[in-house]
Amino acid sequence: MLMPKRVKRRRVHRGKMRGQAHKGNTISYGEYGLMAMEPAWITSNQIEAARIAMTRYIKRGGKVWIKIFPHKPVTKKPAETRMGAGKGSPEYWVAVVKPGRVMFELSGVSEERAREAMRLAMHKLPIKCKFVTREDQEVKGGEANEN
């Protein structure tokens, strides 16, 4: 399970998930990527389940990069506890994902194999996702520069 080694504060505010992803919205390592279409908190267990689903399908052929990390602790109070008495203890860790964020990257396999591996990973995640390729992003980048 992914989690920070050391944190400055054990408990953080929940925050808002407004707007699009400005960082991490392009493919930087691999040839294919899995892009988020909705905002969500992705838990470390969900990230690990998606990673295992992809690596089991591609076997030893390709390489997988995880481009999100769960930095945010989510607290929870024990069951049947009265209100008050402070905030609960940290229960699990989440990564805040906005629309347009590339969460996973993959290379070293064919496109149809990568597409199927990403489809298996999508089923492990609580949001709608989109399969993207490096060529698609280069074409979009070229069109933007011409205008």
Swiss-Prot record:
Pfam family, one: Ribosomal_L16
InterPro entries: Ribosomal_uL16, Ribosomal_uL16_bact-type, Ribosomal_uL16_CS, Ribosomal_uL16_dom, Ribosomal_uL16_sf
Top-rank taxon: Bacteria
Residue segments, region Disordered: 1-20
PROSITE patterns: RIBOSOMAL_L16_1 (PS00586), RIBOSOMAL_L16_2 (PS00701)
SUPFAM superfamilies: Ribosomal protein L16p/L10e
GO CC list: cytosolic large ribosomal subunit
Keywords attached to this entry: Ribonucleoprotein, Ribosomal protein, RNA-binding, rRNA-binding, tRNA-binding
UniProt GO MF annotations: rRNA binding; structural constituent of ribosome; tRNA binding
One GO-annotated biological process of the protein: translation
Summary of subunit composition and partner proteins: Part of the 50S ribosomal subunit.
Family named by the database record: Belongs to the universal ribosomal protein uL16 family.
Function: Binds 23S rRNA and is also seen to make contacts with the A and possibly P site tRNAs.
Protein name: Large ribosomal subunit protein uL16
Naturally occurring in which organism (per UniProt): Alkaliphilus oremlandii (strain OhILAs) (Clostridium oremlandii (strain OhILAs))
Annotated gene: rplP
